[in-house]
Structure formats: C-alpha cells, structure tokens
C-alpha cells in the first residue's frame, strides 16, 4: 500500500492506495499554522492509515513553496 499526502494552506489530505492504485481510504484535516502542528498533522494521517490497514510501503507528499 502507498500513502499520498497533499499539504495545502487550509487542509491536509491523505489517500491510501492499494498496489493497483485503487483508493482504500482517505482522510482530511485542517492544516495547522505552525511547523510542529503541520508535522503532527501529517503523522496523524499516516498513523491513521497504518493503524487501520497495516504498514504502508511508501509515503509521497506534495506541499506548496
């Protein structure tokens, strides 16, 4: 499974894909305005997916800037 994360100015969204690229799960949270808050948010999405579906083989991320 693979995790993709999109960090934006107002929301951070994650998607979990199976090996064929089919969506398994999706989670959206508000983007925190601090560095530490943003990192904690990203980790909360990864932990959500891995706690629910098992360890992912990779994580890809996009963010502005």
For the regions a language model picked out, list residue spans one by one.
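Short beta-strand-loop/turn "lid" adjacent to the catalytic site in phosphate-handling enzymes
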Residues: 51-65
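Short glycine-rich, Thr/Ser-proximal phosphate-binding strand/loop in the N-terminal lobe
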Residues: 2-40, 48
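A generic secondary-structure signal
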Residues: 44-52
């Amino acid at each position: 499974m693979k995790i993709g994360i999109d960090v934006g100015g107002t929301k951070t969204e994650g998607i979990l894909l199976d090996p064929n690229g089919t969506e398994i799960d999706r989670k959206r949270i508000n983007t925190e305005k601090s560095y530490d808050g943003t990192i904690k948010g990203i980790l909360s999405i990864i932990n959500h997916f891995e706690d629910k579906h098992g360890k992912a083989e990779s994580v890809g991320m996009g963010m502005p800037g």
